[in-house]
Design a protein with these regions (language model features):
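Structural signature of nuclease core domains in nucleic-acid processing machines
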Residues: 1-212
């Protein structure tokens, strides 16, 4: 409907760039990359490390953020999250960003936009492992930027502003129905490193202690 598109295009989805709204993307399409495919893999561990498994991935996440303390993921599920496509990557306000469009319903009998409260959106993120998906999208984008912009390895995340999940059935111009996050630098760097080189509990504890 017309109201839906007005709400979508006028939604102010970037907390750190309050003047930005989605309609601006269509005025500058050269800064947009839709359906950006990626493939992350679990590399062979270097000396002194062990292969990153689903349980060690959960341990890594929990070390940085207590929200993950009840996080459970099978090896099959983990492999599924390592390959995919980012719905939209774009440049705005001097940073690079990720958008993921979601169509989840909260109430299958009587779903209304008003149901998409911050608490309900947080529950959708947690229950569907979208928080993990978001972090892996940012690892993938970090790597792409380092290659395409010829940035020194380990610096790509500094150019990223964060990721926004837009739940389309609840979105409005005040950003209801959206979830924004920019995980800690140390978490993204740790995930990137452990995927490439294997897990190290000693390194994890050291990085989590000084995480920013």
């Amino acid at each position: 409907t017309e109201e839906f598109f007005e709400n979508l295009f006028e939604a102010k989805i970037l907390p750190s760039a309050p003047g930005f709204h989605l309609a601006q993307l269509f005025k500058n399409l050269k800064d947009c990359r839709p359906e950006l495919k990626f493939m992350l893999s679990v590399g062979a561990p270097i000396k002194g490390r062990e292969r990153l498994t689903a349980s060690l991935l959960a341990e890594t996440l929990t070390a940085f953020d207590s929200r993950y303390k009840d996080f459970h993921l099978s090896e099959l599920d983990m492999r599924g999250y390592l390959t995919g496509s980012i719905d939209l990557a774009f440049a705005a306000d001097g940073k690079y960003w990720v958008i993921d469009w979601k169509t989840n319903k909260i109430d299958y009998r009587n779903n209304t936009p008003e149901l998409y409260t911050p608490e309900a959106v947080n529950a959708l993120m947690k229950n569907n492992h979208y928080e993990l998906q978001l972090a892996l999208y940012l690892v993938a984008l970090k790597r792409m930027l380092e290659v395409r912009l010829n940035l020194p390895e380990g610096t790509g995340y500094k150019a990223i502003g964060g990721a926004v999940y837009c739940f389309l059935r609840g979105i409005d111009r005040n950003a209801r129905g959206t979830y924004f996050e920019r995980p800690k630098d140390a978490l993204i760097e740790c995930l990137d490193d452990f995927l490439k080189n294997g897990f190290s509990r000693e390194l994890l504890e050291s990085r989590a202690k000084g995480a920013v």
